[in-house]
Amino acid sequence: MNTGVSGADPYILRDGDKYYMYATTPGSVPGFKCHVSDDLQSWQDAGYCLTSEQSFGYKNFWAPEVVKYRGKYIMHYSAREQGSELLRIGVAIADTPEGPFRDAFSQPLLAVEGKSTIDAHCFRDDDGKNYLFFSMDCPTNIVNGVHTSQTMCIRLDDNLTKTIGEYKLISTPDCEWETSQNKEWQWNEGPFVLKHDGKYYLTYSANYYASRKYAVGFAVAERADGPYRKSEKNPILAYVENEMSGPGHNSFFTAKDGKLKCAFHIHADYNDPKGSRVVCVADAGFDKDGDLFVDYK
């Protein structure tokens, strides 16, 4: 289902009887908007929920995710930091899902020296441990001479506002469908983690976002922080001729009817894949073999 909402890297929070959508905005837009819906079909623009005035960043506001926690709403996101000009991960807090969100601190949550970090995803395990998954962005992350986006993981504290210890590598582009398009620039980005029947399912996107081959795969682990094994069924969400171009950077949520849903973006113009994208929602679930699927048809 095409929601008609322009944006990329979408995240949908269900809170009570309403759904709240957050997404990446164009580079020059200084903040994030929130869209609200009762039925996932009709969406109302609720205005800006976070702007550069409440953030460490000043542009390139990307991939916001919001969790409800201890009566507050906590947003993890990335933005461009003045001075270093690197993309950093921030954390902001609000009293309502529509904001206004304000940074918990005057500096980013995560700043890796000389590296841009993006696509923050907070995963709270049922044993009480919290994790932040994120992507080391390929313009500043060079591995064996290749610009490489890799998925990382680091522990979060009990308030979800500080990191604990060191980050570790979770996934890197190493499969044929992830690397055949471009040998000099490669991606594993946009991480999201689900837990099902005691196992951890990591979804991620590979290939260039402005390419029709941008697609979603998944990997499975026995522990939240891995090691993860990529599925042979990948990609599970990919280009469909004459229908859908560049589906990717997904997230999951449970709808009011109890069904698992997947939010993702596609290129707004099938015939002209580029940065302009629109948000879609599809059914998702697990098959008889325990493999994750997204039913986009």
Regions found by a protein language model. Name each.
Residues 1-297:
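Carbohydrate-active catalytic/glycan-binding domains of CAZyme proteins
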